[in-house]
């Protein structure tokens, strides 16, 4: 948006504006597409998708796979055959680095609603006022979800220092009562997770790093997240920090139990310190054939999670509930 605003302020030619990454525009003629024709990936047209569910599904399959690749192409969809109009979508900007993401959160945000809402209650704002975003992106690849289309498949994480600085700033606000309602992101427990070998990620066409099996190249360590949780618990003014974002339990359990001791420790500390009363997870369905279509793990993993949850609450004597979400 900033780059587009700069170009408009400079009265730049449309040809210059059309090459800005991450924008979409309508082209009335082929020569209005500001790109080498050989580098354009044409998707099934709007008319084809409207007339055929298979074409619509194929359109989304291509878009999802190519948009999540390391070097996505310019994508074009013929929108109006009669008028010759084509929708053109440019590739996104590169993934934000930790330093770039930290710089965003260093900006002088007021954490207040616009002055026009003075004296009015905004329920949506109250729900997230004291939540803290740890990272962007999600590699879950659920077939019904568009998070990867919005934020990408790879994780871009803030530094521990950036997170703790923001929390210390929140703790000085008069409205803060000591409760952080979320330490999360699109998926709460993907903080700092990435491929061990980036070159393998660059060559990969999978839309999910977790389905049908967890990728062997994926580093699923919860070490950085555990360090962050422990640090936050000791920040002056913070009485409780709960996790409001969803977690992917297939990152630390399988049908046999915990994948490793680190995953077990993560779940223990999550339940003991970071659940306000109900831990919400999303198995989405109970039948494995349906879950397979949804790119979700077997319901057997939820049963394992429930067993371990009940065991942990019994061990600590806590009265917590596990709430499963289902798509109806």
Name every feature range the model reports, one short phrase each:
Residues 2-13, 98-105, 168:
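Two-component system phosphotransfer/interaction surface
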Residues 118-146, 177-179:
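N-terminal pre-triad scaffold of radical SAM enzymes
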């Amino acid at each position: 948006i900033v780059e587009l605003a700069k170009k408009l302020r400079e009265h730049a030619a449309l040809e210059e504006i059309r090459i800005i990454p991450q924008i979409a525009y309508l082209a009335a003629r082929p020569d209005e597409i500001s790109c080498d024709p050989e580098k354009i990936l044409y998707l099934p047209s709007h008319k084809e998708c409207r007339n055929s569910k298979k074409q619509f599904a194929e359109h989304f399959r291509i878009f999802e796979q190519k948009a999540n690749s390391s070097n996505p192409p310019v994508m074009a969809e013929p929108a109006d055959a009669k008028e010759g109009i084509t929708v053109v979508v440019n590739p996104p900007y590169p993934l934000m680095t930790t330093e770039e993401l930290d710089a965003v959160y260093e900006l002088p945000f007021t954490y207040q609603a616009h002055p026009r809402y003075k004296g009015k209650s905004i329920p949506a704002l109250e729900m997230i006022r004291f939540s803290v975003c740890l990272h962007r992106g999600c590699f879950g690849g659920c077939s019904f979800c568009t998070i990867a289309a919005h934020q990408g498949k790879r994780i871009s994480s803030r530094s521990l220092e950036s997170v703790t600085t923001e929390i210390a700033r929140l703790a000085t606000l008069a409205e803060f009562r000591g409760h952080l309602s979320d330490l999360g992101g699109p998926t709460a427990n993907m903080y700092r997770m990435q491929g061990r070998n980036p070159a393998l990620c660059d060559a990969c066409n999978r839309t999910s790093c977790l389905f049908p099996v967890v990728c062997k190249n994926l580093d699923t360590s919860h070490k950085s997240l555990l360090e962050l949780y422990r640090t936050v618990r000791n920040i002056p003014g913070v009485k409780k920090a709960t996790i409001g974002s969803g977690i992917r339990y297939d990152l630390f359990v399988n049908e046999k139990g915990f994948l490793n001791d680190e995953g077990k420790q993560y779940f223990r500390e999550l339940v003991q310190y970071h659940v306000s009363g109900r831990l919400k997870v999303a198995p989405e369905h109970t039948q494995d054939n349906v879950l397979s279509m949804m790119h979700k793990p077997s319901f057997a993993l939820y049963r394992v999670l429930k067993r371990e949850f009940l065991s942990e609450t019994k061990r600590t004597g806590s009265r917590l509930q596990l709430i499963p979400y289902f798509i109806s």
